[in-house]
Amino acid sequence: MKTGLVTSDTYQNHNTGEGHPEKIDRVTAVIDNFKKIDNKKLVWKKPAKFDQSLLINTHSSKYIDLVNKSFPENGLAFLDGDTVVSPGSKEATKDAVGSIITAIDGVQQKEFKNAFCAVRPPGHHAEKDKAMGFCIYNNVAVGANYLIEKYKYNKIAIIDFDVHHGNGTQDIFYNNEKVLYISTHQYPYYPGSGSDKETGKFNNILNIPLEAGTTAEQFLNAYENVLKKLKEFKPEFLLFSAGFDAHIDDPLAQLRLSSEDFYHLTKRTLEVSKSMCNGNVVSILEGGYDLRALQDSTKRHVDALIEFN
């Protein structure tokens, strides 16, 4: 089978303003690089429209109304100090969520074995009632809830290797025994959450805080704890919150991974998860702000997905 690549041109209309690190060029760089991959190995898909009621399982109706009213007719508006929306953000946010829904449906219907969603805005900082850190809707959380509600899964694992802790995803699933959330991240650092003492009501949260300057070897050694927890939980479906800002060249953090390290951690995770979830894996883009590093790292991440087929 092949790997799905789900993306939409609407990300280009999500304007965050001059000088903002979460810019249009991020996804353009990723997609341009994927176009060089042998097309026989990829299934390109556009996100399907989805029922907005799907958001209710993840975000409050009050927050959804707030977001819908926030998109300006022109110019820019702010949901928080660094989360910016423009007129085109409305469709971009819908397509970011729609991408993970489409990817999950494609895996479930055996259209492809696994999938990567190249989207913006990212999602893992968005809480149930709050936009934060460039994130509006929590894309991966909507995906996890969709798996539970539509496909009746009882064990979903989310692995978040973005350099920033996914406070939003943790907030949404802190008391949900059906979802295991694991995060490797620089700590202490933005957003301030993510200590190893935050474990969830059902021991369903695993935070692996890493000091600034953590090397690739140290990171990959720590990542063995991710795999150990995965084996204990035995997920039926695996989601990646795939941020690539732990790369040594990323301007927003101080971890020291290479693009090749993202290949190895992805491959290792897929090997471990095979016996549990039969390769049911969907990955969605989060952070990564050096364009060349982001290009190379997403390519190697998807290479691992393709090889697993």
Kindly give the residue locations of the regions a language model identified:
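HDAC/HDAC-like amidohydrolase catalytic core signature
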Residues: M1-N309
